[in-house]
UniProtKB/Swiss-Prot annotation:
It comes from Caenorhabditis elegans. Disruption phenotype: RNAi-mediated knockdown causes abnormal male tail development. Abnormal fusion of structures in male-specific genital sensilla (simple sense organs) known as rays. Abnormal fusion of rays 6 and 7 enhanced in a sma-6 mutant background. Reduced fecundity in hermaphrodites. In response to nano-polystyrene, causes decreased locomotion behavior and increased reactive oxygen species (ROS) production. Intestine-specific RNAi-mediated knockdown causes increased ROS production and reduces expression of daf-16 and sod-3. The gene is mab-31. This is Male abnormal protein mab-31. Induction: Induced by exposure to nano-polystyrene particles. Signal peptide: none annotated. The keyword tRNA-binding does not apply. It comes from the Eukaryota. One of its GO terms (cellular component) is nucleus. GO terms for molecular function: DNA-binding transcription factor activity, RNA polymerase II-specific. Putative transcription factor. Acts in a TGF-beta-like pathway during development of male-specific genital sensilla (simple sense organs), known as rays. Involved in production of reactive oxygen species (ROS), acting downstream of the TGF-beta-like dbl-1 signaling pathway. Involved in locomotory behavior. Its main location: nucleus. It is found in: Nucleus.
């Protein structure tokens, strides 16, 4: 088992006292050099960056309260240098000095596959411990593909595939191109954030608060802002921040539905139940440049095949039975059973009138009509809408894609959201 997964899977082995002592020991063991007047600090070796990942999560650290010596990544200390200097050359042999700088956060072999995050058991305490240390935090993000493990300089004058060095800056860890810095050309930015181009780039929240809120939102649909803050405890957030963060996660899910999971062929089929949901949706989604504080909504109609959890949508609302027929022919196979809320069905008329208008290609029913035919699993999925509808003004929120996501991933919803984020930002 990977050491990071061991920590998350076995939080009972850690106590607050041992965790604090281990973090203090690690903080005192790091070795950084002042590099220039900008307070940059080069990471001088691979072990320097990996010490948190391999040692902080190693149970032996908390048992012995000291780093293991002479094993794994912590070799035996070098023998003391001779003070006489008779056997020490004045100038080292050319090429004997190791390359300085760090071009990856982790070894590429330590970066997990997209599905491995699904095996982790997260809770608020684990996330708080991970992100309480900046170095361990970016190692966690790099391991699960939430930030790039390496960066290539995009400046035209740099050599092709020129890797950037990871350094510790006054504002945190950044990537810096040493070639650009050596040229000292004006108007060239030699440093970029480790979060640039990721979903965290526009965030102004501390990472511990951001991920703990994501976890609470995934596990508790339909809560009010007051209830979410009660779960957050000392990490409580202001109303605007909660609203923007929820909107951001819904945009991520909508983008995943539109670009990855949406069916390219009509869904449903003979005797299969397809649910119709009218919802708002966010326009002009963009992973790389969108500021999540600015949103413009449009109305969509979403079709969900309940048996196999497939989704398809049209970019127009349904005002009458002709619009319904047009949307069904585009998205749903003939012979399907179309279900919707009673209040939504009233827009098109009575059930028999609707079926006749559709030339009996589809059977139209309400949710109440088919409820006795649902098994317990499907009833639990339908109850997700009941929980989400407890939020005031729910009809003014783009919730249909969130409902579909929660249907698909009722278990470990937070883990699946992390996986979806990785898939989207690697495109």
């Amino acid at each position: 088992m990977n050491s990071l997964e061991y920590l998350i899977a076995n939080p009972h082995i850690l106590s607050d006292t041992t965790l604090t002592d281990a973090l203090a020991a690690l903080a005192s063991s790091t070795n950084v050099e002042n590099q220039d007047e900008e307070f940059d600090m080069e990471v001088n070796s691979d072990d320097e960056m990996k010490i948190d990942l391999s040692a902080l999560i190693n149970p032996s650290v908390f048992n012995a309260l000291q780093l293991p010596i002479g094993t794994g990544r912590f070799p035996n200390p070098s023998p003391p240098r001779s003070s006489s200097g008779t056997n020490t050359p004045i100038r080292k042999t050319p090429g004997s000095r190791p390359d300085r700088g760090k071009f990856t956060i982790l070894d590429n072999a330590e970066v997990a596959g997209p599905e491995e995050v699904l095996n982790v058991n997260f809770d608020s305490e684990i996330l708080q411990r991970i992100f309480s240390d900046p170095k361990l935090g970016i190692q966690f993000l790099a391991r699960y593909g939430l930030i790039p493990n390496t960066r290539v300089c995009r400046v035209q004058d740099c050599p092709k595939d020129q890797l950037m060095s990871l350094i510790k800056h006054a504002n945190g860890f950044v990537w810096r191109c040493r070639s650009c810095r050596k040229r000292r050309e004006k108007r060239i930015i030699t440093k970029i954030s480790v979060y640039e181009g990721t979903f965290l780039f526009y965030s102004r929240m501390p990472l511990n608060k951001f991920f703990i809120f994501m976890l609470n939102w995934c596990e508790n649909p339909g809560l009010s802002i007051t209830e979410y803050n009660r779960l957050m405890g000392e990490n409580r957030l202001v109303e605007e921040t909660i609203y923007n963060t929820i909107g951001f996660m819904r945009d991520i899910i909508q983008n995943w539905c539109d670009t990855i999971i949406s069916s390219h062929v009509p869904i449903g089929g003979p005797h299969r139940v397809v649910e119709v949901v009218e919802t708002l949706s966010t326009e002009q989604l963009s992973n790389k440049t969108r500021n999540r504080r600015t949103r413009h909504y449009t109305t969509r109609t979403v079709f969900i095949s309940l048996a196999d959890d497939k989704i398809k949508s049209v970019d127009f609302p349904l005002h009458n039975v002709n619009d319904l027929e047009r949307a069904l022919l585009e998205c749903v196979q003939p012979g399907s059973i179309i279900v919707m809320r009673d209040s939504f069905m009233e827009r098109f008329g009575q059930q028999e009138e609707i079926s006749n208008a559709l030339f009996n290609h589809y059977k139209v029913k309400s949710i109440c009509d088919v409820w006795p035919d649902f098994n317990e699993r499907e009833r639990n999925k339908q109850y997700i809408k009941t929980e989400m509808n407890q939020v005031p003004n729910v009809n003014q929120e783009p919730y249909a894609y969130e409902y579909f996501f929660r249907r698909c991933f009722a278990d470990k919803c937070f883990n699946h959201l992390l996986r979806v984020i990785r898939l989207l930002y690697q495109k």
